[in-house]
């Protein structure tokens, strides 16, 4: 049975056990493996920037940081992680749900190395090794806010969602977004599609262009680099075609077309957890899944203060007056029981 910890505020250390691996005062090497590309202007970029911040802020504790990216199969992930181990890494971060299985294997085989993984998808019966910390995010909470804004912003009454690969995490974006939109306007029409890629800019552009041609005027995406294609489609069409980004504030890419972005600040989460590890004399207290959401400040909208009603919704979500769906089953219950549709 896995143990899930809910983090409140930045009091991160209080949530971990005192049963970690051995401490050390030596300078450490921190490595990171991401699925995809490092400079994706989104998810992976945030994680990479966090490593660079750590090196700058803890020069007396960190010998070096190293990041690498790969898009491949399970054996490729394991091989690259083995190379990072051989390079002398003390702490290795894995970024992306595709690395879920690899995280369990390498952490079990290398108990003296500390591991962290962002966005894994574990079954309820998975035992998390004591040298592994898993971090997951309540992205549906931020997507709910984005969906509410999209429904209010749309002039056509039609909005869209483009996800990358179908799965738990992308579905959380989708159903959070759709729930928020329906909460704002029960009659809003929503079309959702998947690009089946986190790296194909062209397919993102193609799907978005088709959506816009059908009268959709707001698209939220959670599709990695494929999302760049969505932005390009809106930018090329000009005024009246809007996008809502994911993971980082991407508004600088098309200021006239962006409404907001659903921030999933994995960089802050990675920085906080690693920083506590360093401050705690290199004791990595794992064996747990840590959930972070709106309450923790790592999920949200960068311009939430521009929308008065969003602050009200945030409070309702944090206080559990609104329980945001993260999958299709929960969404259907939400629609029937909460919205009476």
UniProtKB/Swiss-Prot annotation:
The keyword Ligase does not apply. A lipid is attached at residue 15 (S-diacylglycerol cysteine). It is found in: Cell inner membrane. Residues 1-14 form the signal peptide. Changing residue 45 to A: In strain: 212. It is a lipid-anchor. InterPro entries: BMP_lipoprotein, Peripla_BP_I, PnrA-like. It comes from the Bacteria. May be part of an ABC-type nucleoside uptake system involved in the purine salvage pathway. Belongs to the BMP lipoprotein family. Monomer. PANTHER family: ABC TRANSPORTER GUANOSINE-BINDING PROTEIN NUPN, TRANSCRIPTIONAL ACTIVATOR PROTEIN MED. This is Basic membrane protein B. It comes from Borreliella burgdorferi (strain ATCC 35210 / DSM 4680 / CIP 102532 / B31).
